[in-house]
Structure formats: structure tokens, C-alpha cells
Amino acid sequence: MSYPGHLFDATTAALLSPPDYINPTPQGRYHLVVVGAGPAGLISAIGAAGLGSKVALIERHRMGGDCLNVGCVPSKALLEYTSYHKNPDFDEAFAWLREVRAGIAPHDSVARYGEAGVDVYLGDASFNSAGEICVGDQPLPARRIAICTGARAAIPPIPGLRESNPLTNESVFDLTEKPASLAILGAGAIGCELALVFARLNVEVHLFELAPRVLPLEVTAASEAVGEALRSAGVTLHLGAGVESVAARDDGAPGHSVSVNGKQVLTSHVLVALGRIPNTETLNLQSAGIDTTERGLIVTDKKLRTSNKKVYAAGDCTSTLQFTHHADAQARAIVQNTLFAPTASVDKLVVPHCTYTKPEVASVGQNPDHLEAAGVDYDCYEFNFAELDRGRAEINGDGFAQVYTEKGSDKILGATIVGHDAGEQIAPICLLMSNRLGLSAAGKALFSYPTRSEYLKRLADAYNRSRFTPRVAAIFKAWLGFTA
């Protein structure tokens, strides 16, 4: 089938899952067998191989996992394309995402990992005992095993939803024709980002969310900023709206009827963005004595060991913090703990997250909702980017930053940033938190002028001013009077 960008798809497939590939024959015991070639698995495998160990990597679909194939890369390519072009064309936008994906594919390819010393096996993995895993019928002897199988979109038990064959992140980027209209179930990060993309492509978009606001896990001000932006882009928001059923249209026309709060919304396509479930059900974990939660997440300790101490796990199959950068950090711990003494812990990682709408929303640590629910006293320091000289000079110079500190202290508990570069601006706060540096430490740094990064120095100044109590002021006054 020919469509714009189809040659890029062929290139990507040939690199990530070559059809004529023949699995190697195991030669002795592996130091590490990694199951799953997404971010956690790729980094674990190439990191271990780079240290000289003997490594096998098993992948049942395509190298690169969700991030490259059906997640971060294609979604950000579409967001960038539709933001840059005033009247973006659907075919050209999707051809661009395919070109971007094909350009990154060599980095995650079977060939690259083979050249790095990793034995790549394409096929289904499963345990046949507590100490042995197979790819197909082939056992792979291993000293240690790392499960990095990721997660996939959940299809909740809404009547008629599964039968409607809805789009998910695994299929939406394969579209070759523009939908006439789109109902998106779930206004988390994925739902909001894709709503913005398709609205920019002149698709009629309906976004449904059970909570009273989009991005319900963010602070209210951030949610409201994104909600307003989505409305301005043409998205129809259905908030506090529990979808009751999805059915074929009554009038016989192609498409779907989404029932919500007693009303019917007609759309040509439905997309589900209502959470994710781990890819663990085919691994035969019980035979290996590996415990899971009710949701199927693999239970690990702070060193990523499972209940089978020979087996470790990392990435989306273990955690509700399902971000590529989190998987990256866990994978680095996997390399240390499986090859050497298990000294690397992941229980105190500082994990930011970002929604790449316009404006972007980035957060790290705890926010006021978490702190108040836990009964923690805190101070909030806030600064609006429009008050910066750079912000005044920019057309999109609005947005704000909030930093939450321990009451009466500069210890940072969390932060929220809203603005067109929030994902970049959250980084120095993560650096401070990771190194246990307080907000006042930012006041000692020099920031280029005029930049939006100056917000952090302004927040540090605000904290330092808070220490100028009446008692301190009286001492200063006395000293200045004495030295006059």
C-alpha cells in the first residue's frame, strides 16, 4: 500500500524487526538476558555489553519499544510539525513523523546492537522454571535476567468500546487518512497532546474526562491553562463526563455514537487514552516464582530485584511512573546490580514529567494537593514569566513557575512549571533536588540575561527575602546606624 511516508515505514521495519533475521545460537551461559527492547531493555543490554559481559536481548515485536514506535517520538514529531506550520496538512504531518521515526531507528536497530556485542533474539519470551527463560522453544542459560517488557494501552470495560476497535497510541500513528472527527477518552497527557495535534489538523475533536478538569493530576492553574488552550484550538471538552457506552451510529452511517451523561456524540473515530497495563501476562511468571500486583505490575524492591532474586525488572512493567527517562535511570541500576554488587537503589529518584501541549506543563516531586493531603506544611514561591524582560519581549512569553518548599526552609519538595518551554525549565530544579540543594543555592548562580531561566533566580531571591524578618531588619538597622 502506498501512502505519504510509506517508504520510511518500510525502512523502520527493516531496521527494527528485519523479516529475514535468523536468531543466533546460544554459546554458553549469558551474564544477562534482557526481555524487551524498549528504553529500559535497550539501555540495560548495551550498557552491560559495553562492560564486556555476555548479553542476550529478546524482543517480540520491534526494537525501540513504545517510545520510538508508538509513543514519545511520533507524538512529539506531530506536535512540532503542527505547531510550526500554520495550516498543517494531514498527509505531510504524518509523513514527517514517519521520516523522524526512520531517522532514529538505526540507533535502536538489530544491527547496531549486534555490532555492540548483544545477541538479539526476535520472538516471544517465557519462563519454564525459576532459573530459565526461553525465546520460543530455545532456552537461554543466564546468570541474571532482566524483565523490561513495558506496558500497553488499557481498554476499560465500557460497553461496546472494545467492539468498536478503538484507536490507541499503538495504532493512531499508523493512520493513512485523516479522520473526519475524533472522540478521545481520557484527558491525561496522551489525550491532551493528541487532541491538540488533531485539532490543528482541522479534525473535529471531542475530549472526554471523568474528572472536572483536564490533566487532573496537575495543579488546578496548570490544568486550567491547558484546558483554555485546547478550547482555543477548537477542541470540545466534556469534563465530569463518564462515558457510558460506545456503539455504531443509529443512522447507519460509518462511525460511532459515544454515550455520555445521557447524550450522544457522533464521531468517525474513537481513541482510548485511559491508562496502561503491563505486558507481563505471557511470560509465565508464576513458574519463575515472580510476584505481581493485581494490575500485573512486577513487584520489585528498591534495587529492582523481584521475588526471584535471580530476576530483576525495570521500566513500565514495574511502575506507575511510566516515562522513558525513568526507565533509563532504572536500566543503569540494572547494569550495576546484575553484573556487580547490588548497590544501586532507585527509591529516591527525582522523576519529572511533562505534557507537551501549548503551553507545556512540567512537574516534579509533590504538589500542593499531595502536600495538603499528607498534612505537610509548605511554602509556595511563584513567578510569572511575563514579568521577565525576556517574557515581555516574547509573543508566547506567558506562563508561571511554582516551587514548593518545606515550611520555613529552602528544601524543595516539588515544582510545577507552565509555559512553552516548561520541560526544559524544570531541569535545573531536578538538578537541585537530586543533589539535595535548597532553593537558595540557585541564587548563587549566574543566569544569562535575558532568558526565561532567570525565573529560578527570582524564586531564590523571594526565598531569601522571606528570611529578612523584622528581627533581622532591626539588627541591620542597628548595624547601619552604628557604621554611619
Tell where the protein language model's regions lie, with residue ranges.
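N-terminal Rossmann-like dinucleotide/flavin-binding domain of flavoprotein oxidoreductases
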Residues: 2-28, 67-70, 74-139, 218-244, ...
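Flexible, glycine-rich terminal cap/loop adjacent to redox cofactors
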Residues: 4, 35-40, 49-61, 73, ...
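Glycine-rich dinucleotide-binding loop and its adjacent helix/turn
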Residues: 12-20, 72, 149-204, 208, ...
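Rossmann-like dinucleotide-binding cores of NAD(P)H-dependent redox enzymes
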Residues: 21, 99-106, 173-174, 179-183, ...
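Core beta-strand elements of the Rossmann-like FAD/NAD(P) dinucleotide-binding domain
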Residues: 28-30, 136-144, 261-269, 307
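Glycine-rich FAD pyrophosphate-binding loop
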Residues: 49-66, 203-214
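A Rossmann-like FAD-binding core segment of flavoenzymes
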Residues: 107, 119-122, 126-134, 201-302, ...
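FAD-site-proximal beta/loop scaffold in flavoenzymes
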Residues: 162-178, 264-340, 428
